[in-house]
Structure formats: structure tokens, C-alpha cells
UniProtKB/Swiss-Prot annotation:
The lineage of its organism: Eukaryota, Fungi, Dikarya, Ascomycota, Pezizomycotina. Belongs to the glycosyl hydrolase 3 family. It is found in: Secreted. This is Probable beta-glucosidase L. GO terms for molecular function: beta-glucosidase activity.
Length: 737
């Protein structure tokens, strides 16, 4: 089993990814930007902050090009997993899969590779990564674009992705800021959350993004406590630019701007796409209207100068003044690029991430890995590429064939798509295995195929996406958490032929599995998420035992939809009544037994935990440091470490994600029983031991005090939980502050 083996080329790429860094500091970038500012005319300044209208340039967003300085029309392009519309590009696994790897190195490398392809195509601002939707609602349409509904895991992934992307010379854009937690009514709903919930959940990963020097942040469509996100003074000026010390620029989501003067004065720096989507272009809030507002004093000149300085500084920060390539594609004519930015290493990286994100949920009596059986039934439409073509549905707005992306603006055009059946046939070529197929979702046909086989693999799906596309009655958000296309009935029909049945689930997030798990002949269940272009290869790597599965769930799978405590609403208001208690925090707080808990994932080997060591030293009380990029300077001060020994006690090589959870003392008011505050992925051969080390900061043991308006370390005894998941705790300890 080759759990630890990667090609020399990929290892070299990973090593180089970790060695990359920022081109300039913010101070250096601001010095250059300030020098340029004095050379610009008022018209040029307004052009830099205003989009040139929808489809007014080759990219989904474009700005006006000044002539007084050597600065281009900026190209802003989706997205969070590849370069939208362009081809050829590498279609990486979705953010939710990257999160399921729990692997900092792979998430950083994914960012480096995506950034390199974006830069090679001339993109200046890559619209990703995603921390909003965070994922409080398990059925929300765009959760899959982000990494996890846990803010700590999401924050670590955001930082790694941003550092990777920007090291390749492209500006990252952290989105969607803030509380954009559902698609239904996303452009009218008011997300009403209290200050503490905002800080400890939804703002948390944006702290990490800003600390990682993210160049830009996208404000969202929704209102927050009654005020539009893109004209929210407390949100943009108070929190983002004030408390977090953000130095980059804030750009609107496409048509999320609602005013000229108010949006300018409350912190918006760039409007996208500059007009609405009508043809010819309709309302334009900035451009001439912004110039007029400055002329009559409604918007101070200093505010425009600040907008321009922030945008120019972000451009300098990542070295885009140093030979950045011209835009090499058009979003509006099929996207054929004049250069090929894909590489073999990027393809191998996509396969590695997809493979390492696979979560083994059930494995009765070692049913996996599969030997090469005499006969194998492969069942379900998810086993093959969409018969109309992998890219047949615009923005992947259908669920036909194998599911490897969700739908919406966060998608890309497949250069190729390896379907599971293709990879299985490739894997078993020459093995003498008879492969019997039923590549529809018809239960009768599936049962007939299974009855003729020694083992059956059933492929099922659950899809979602952005609300401007409706797929099979789902308006972005999922209507429920059931498998699509009568997946429960298909699995039942197959399993009731008494054939050992393996279920492979391609989904955007949690799916209710109780009907499937009630079938005694369902011997294994695998969650493969949205694995991108190398889907089939990654899956067969695990199914046939070339690699041990090492993914862990970045969300909880409950036994029913009611278990989660949050759902999307048809109302114009969401009061976020669940507060801090989402996902595993909710399950823990209310004593609900999940089907598969947050952080869960089986392996083909076993691991033993021992020798917990805790060395923490700090003082209780609030933060007192000055604001730097990322927040108060002492918030990220190291306070010590927790460590544990982990040994591979099985017979094959494997990787274990060792997880640290912290429980707060009673002096911390109304707080979840435990919260993720560290993870370390150890790759171990049989008999090998390693040390999982978790370095803690003050933030990791702080809560937000609404009265003080500061992060506070509570006094008392903190509980330490180290384990293989949020419920599988192997070691416990404590420390006192």
C-alpha cells in the first residue's frame, strides 16, 4: 500500500509550495501605491474603482485602465476551484474536499497551482477562497465551495490557500463577507446575528484570511442586521478595516451594491461588475455618479484616494507590476486560451487531493479494500460521465453523470473527467474480472446487475449550487438531505439481492444515510465529495487498496435533518437563533447522537494514542495589543503546546488526522462544550510512531466579550481532548489559567 508515495515531481512541487512567500510587505506596497496616486487624474481614479460593466471585457470583472501610470485594466475571475470559463485548466477538487484532507501542505499546494494557472491566463484577482457560506445550514447551496463549517478548520485552510495563491502572483479574494448562509432570497434577506456569534464563528476565518495578507475581500449580497453588507459601516470600516487591520480592497459581489454615496463612505472600494446584467447596461452607481458625489462633497476626496491606494497596493503586494501576463482568454466566446497553463504536476496534485479527501464511513469486516473479484457490478448514473458531455450544462447546472463539482459561478470547464467506471475498467484490465454495468438510476436494472455479480458498487449523489440556476427543483439550496435520483431505493434494490454492496457517495455535504445503513448487505460506505477531474482515479486508488483512506469529515452527518438545528428559510429574515451552536457544537450542546461525527473517518490500518503532554502559560483577561494586520497584536501570541504520541499499530501505511479540542472553564459564558483548536496529519508506516504537536495562541482559548469589545481569556481550568474525531477522544488532560 502506497500511502506515503508521491512522484518526485509532485514532491518537488509541494516543497516549492511551502517555500514561496509574499513579494512585498503592505508597507512597501503602500509606498508604491501612494507614489502612483499623485500621478492620476480624477477620472482615472474613478475608473480604477469602477467596473466597466458586465461583459465589458474578457473577464467576469474588469476595471478601466489609466494612462498616467503603467497599470492595467484589472481582470477579476472566478473562482474557488479553478479559472471559470477558460480552457484548458485544471479542475481541482472542491473546497469541501480540500478541507476533508485536513492537510495544510495539500491545501497550500492547491492554492499555488490555482494561482499559477490564474496568473498564466492573465487573471489579476482570483475570486476565492470561500469562508462564507460557513455552513451553518447543512443543505445550503454553496457550502461545498468552502472548506468546513468549523471556523478553525476553515480559517487554517483559508490562510494556506491565500498564501499559496498569492505566492503565485495572483490576488486572492476572501468571500463572501459576511453571513451569506443560504441561496434562497440571498439578495434580499437580512441575516441577523449577535456580535459574539459573528466574532466566534463567521468572522473567525476572515481573521485568518487577513492575517495571511489577503489582497481583497468580497462583500456579500445579503443584509446584516438590516443593512446591506456592501454598505455596512460597522462590518467594513469597523470590523474588517478597523478591528482586523485589513489593508487590501473590498469589492462588491456582482450587483451587490445598492447606493453611490453610502457604499463609498462605509467602506466599499470597488464595484463589480460596474453595472447590472442588462443589455445595454443599466444602473451604474459609481463612474460618473461617484465623480459627482465627490464634486459636491457627499463623498470626501480622501475616501476615493483611499480606495485607489488600497487597490494599487494589492496589485503591488503580489508583484503584478513585474511582468504579469496579458489576459489570454475571453469568458464570452468559449474561453479557449492562447496558452496552456496546465501541467502534469497539477493533474497529479488534483488526484492526490481527491484521494486524500475520501472518507471511509463504514467498512464491515474489512470489505474494503477490494481484491480483484471474479465479477463486479457497477451501478448508477454517477458511475459515468454525463452522456451529453462533461461540460454540457452551463456552469455545471445539472446532475447528470458523475458528480465532480457543484453548480454556479464557482465551477470550471473540465479538460477531461475520469469517471469511476472508466477508472475501474482501467484498474481491472487483464485481471479477468467480469464488470457488469447498470449506468442508470433504475432500481430494477441495478438489482439485475447486482444479482449477477460477486460484489456491487452503487454510486449515488446529492448536488447543490448557486441560486441563479435551478436544478431538478432545487433553487441552489437543497430541498432536503436525501440522496438524489431515488438513491435510497437504488441501494435498497441492490442490497436486497444479497450481494455485498459498497456505496459511493458524491455529494456537496451531509446526506441522510439511515435508509441505506439499515440494509445489512451494505458492507461499506465511502464519501468522495466533489473530487474534480481525477475523480475515478482517486477513488480506485482507495477502493483497491493502493492507498489507505485518510480523509476526515469536515462536517457532521446526522441521523435526520432535524438533528442539525438550522435550515434555510423562505422568510426575509434569518435571526441566527442557534447562535454559537452549529454542526458538532449543536450536537454536543444538546446531547444528539450523530450518525458520523465531525472529524470522523476510518482507515485500513489502526492507530494508538499515548503520552499526552500539555505546556500552556498565559494570563487571563482581555487583549491589550495594538491593531496589526489580522487583529490585536497579542491575540496571536503563542501560549504553549499540546502534544501526543501516535503509533501505526496496523499492517499497512496510513495517515491519521490527530485532532485537538478545547473545553472552556465555567467562567466563559454560554460556550460550546468543546471546540476544535488544532490538528496534525501524521503519515506513518506500520510500527512507526510520530508526535502530533499543536501550537496554541491566545485566540485559541479566548471568547468575545460583547461588553468589553475584546477577546478575553477566561480564568479557570481548560479541558484538553485529543482524538481521532470530535467524539472519538483518546486522551484527556487540562491546564489552568
Amino acid at each position: 500500500m502506497r500511502s506515503l508515495i508521491r512522484s518526485g515531481a509532485l514532491n518537488a512541487f509541494l516543497a516549492a509550495s511551502l517555500a514561496t512567500g509574499q513579494v512585498l510587505t503592505w508597507d512597501e506596497a503602500y509606498t508604491k501605491a501612494t507614489s502612483d496616486l499623485s500621478l492620476l487624474s480624477q477620472e482615472e481614479k474613478v475608473g480604477i474603482v469602477t467596473g466597466v460593466t458586465w461583459q465589458g471585457g474578457p473577464c467576469v470583472g474588469n476595471t478601466y485602465e489609466p494612462t498616467s501610470i503603467p497599470y492595467p485594466s484589472l481582470c477579476l475571475q472566478d473562482g474557488p476551484l479553478s479559472v471559470r470559463f477558460a480552457n484548458p485548466v485544471t479542475v481541482f477538487p472542491a473546497g469541501i474536499n480540500a478541507g476533508a484532507t485536513w492537510d495544510r501542505e495539500l491545501i497550500r499546494a492547491r492554492g499555488v497551482a490555482m494561482g499559477a494557472e490564474s496568473r498564466g491566463l492573465g487573471v489579476h484577482v482570483q475570486l476565492g477562497p470561500v469562508a462564507g457560506a460557513l455552513g451553518k445550514i447543512p443543505s445550503a447551496g454553496r457550502n461545498w465551495e468552502g472548506f468546513s463549517n468549523d471556523p478553525y478548520l476553515a480559517g487554517i485552510a483559508m490562510a494556506e490557500a491565500i498564501q499559496g495563491m498569492q505566492s503565485s502572483g495572483v490576488q486572492a479574494c476572501a468571500k463572501h463577507y459576511l453571513l451569506n448562509e443560504q441561496e434562497y432570497n440571498r439578495d434580499t434577506i437580512s441575516s441577523n446575528a449577535d456580535d459574539r456569534t459573528i466574532h466566534e464563528l463567521y468572522l473567525w476565518p476572515f481573521y485568518d484570511a487577513v492575517k495571511a495578507n489577503v489582497a481583497s475581500v468580497m462583500c456579500s449580497y445579503n443584509k446584516i442586521n438590516g443593512t446591506w453588507a456592501c454598505e455596512h459601516d460597522a462590518l467594513l470600516n469597523g470590523l474588517l478595516k478597523g478591528e482586523l487591520g485589513f489593508k487590501g480592497h473590498v469589492l462588491s459581489d456582482w450587483n451587490a451594491q445598492h447606493s453611490t454615496v453610502q457604499s463609498a463612505n462605509t467602506g466599499l472600494d470597488m464595484t463589480m461588475p460596474g453595472s447590472d446584467f442588462s443589455t445595454p447596461p443599466g444602473s451604474i452607481y459609481w463612474g460618473d455618479n461617484l465623480a459627482a458625489a465627490i464634486a459636491d462633497g457627499s463623498v470626501p476626496q480622501e475616501r476615493l484616494d483611499d480606495m485607489v491606494t488600497r487597490i494599487l497596493a494589492a496589485w503591488y503586494l503580489v508583484g503584478q507590476d513585474q511582468g504579469h501576463p496579458p489576459v489570454a482568454f475571453s469568458s464570452w466566446d468559449g474561453g479557449a486560451a492562447s496558452v496552456n497553463v496546465t501541467t502534469p504536476e497539477h493533474g497529479e496534485l488534483a488526484r492526490t487531493i481527491a484521494r486524500d479527501s475520501i472518507v471511509l464511513l463504514k467498512n464491515t469486516n474489512g470489505s474494503l479494500p477490494l481484491a480483484k473479484p471474479a465479477s463486479l457490478a457497477v451501478i448508477g448514473s454517477d458511475a459515468i460521465v454525463n452522456p451529453d458531455g462533461a461540460n454540457a450544462c452551463a456552469d455545471r447546472g445539472c446532475n447528470k453523470g458523475t458528480l465532480a463539482q457543484g453548480w454556479g459561478s464557482g465551477t470550471a470547464e473540465f479538460p477531461y473527467l475520469v469517471a469511476p467506471l472508466d477508472a475501474i475498467e482501467e484498474k481491472l484490465a487483464g485481471a479477468g474480472t467480469a464488470i457488469i454495468t447498470s449506468t442508470t438510476d433504475d432500481a430494477t436494472s441495478g438489482a439485475e446487475a447486482a444479482a449477477a455479480a460477486e460484489t456491487a458498487i452503487v454510486f449515488i449523489t446529492s448536488d447543490s449550487g448557486e441560486g441563479y440556476i435551478t436544478v431538478e427543483g432545487h433553487e441552489g439550496d437543497r430541498n432536503n438531505l436525501d440522496p438524489w435520483h431515488n438513491g435510497n431505493l437504488l441501494v435498497q434494490a441492490v442490497a436486497r439481492t444479497n450481494t455485498p454492496t459498497i456505496v459511493v457517495l458524491h455529494s456537496v455535504g451531509p446526506v441522510t444515510l439511515e435508509t441505506i445503513l439499515a440494509e445489512p448487505n451494505v458492507v461499506a460506505v465511502v464519501w468522495a465529495g466533489l473530487p474534480g477531474q481525477e475523480s475515478g482515479h482517486a477513488l480506485t486508488d482507495v477502493l483497491f487498496g493502493d492507498y489507505a483512506p485518510s480523509g476526515k469529515l469536515p462536517f457532521t452527518i446526522g441521523k435526520s435533518e432535524e438533528d442539525y438545528g438550522a435550515d434555510w428559510t423562505t422568510s426575509q429574515v434569518d435571526d441566527f437563533a442557534e447562535g454559537l451552536f452549529i454542526d458538532y457544537r449543536h450536537f454536543d450542546q444538546y446531547g444528539i447522537e450523530p450518525r458520523y461525527e465531525f472529524g470522523f473517518g476510518l482507515s485500513y490500518t489502526s492507530f494508538n494514542y499515548s503520552t499526552l503532554s500539555t505546556s500552556i502559560s498565559t494570563t487571563p483577561g482581555p487583549t491589550t495589543g495594538e491593531t496589526i494586520v489580522g487583529g490585536p497584536s497579542d491575540l496571536f501570541a503563542p501560549i504553549g503546546t499540546v502534544s501526543a504520541y501516535v503509533a501505526n499499530t496496523g499492517h499497512v501505511a496510513g495517515a491519521e488526522v490527530v485532532q485537538l479540542y478545547i473545553g472552556y472553564p465555567d467562567s466563559a459564558p454560554s460556550i460550546p462544550p468543546k471546540q476544535l483548536r488544532g490538528f496534525d496529519k501524521l503519515h506513518l508506516v506500520p510500527g512507526e510512531s510520530g508526535i502530533a504537536t499543536f501550537e496554541l495562541t491566545r485566540r485559541d482559548i479566548s471568547y468575545w466579550d460583547v461588553g468589553l469589545q475584546k477577546w478575553v481569556v477566561a480564568s479557570g481550568t481548560f479541558e484538553v481532548f485529543v482524538g481521532a474525531s470530535s467524539r472519538d477522544i483518546r486522551l484527556t488532560g487540562s491546564f489552568t489559567v
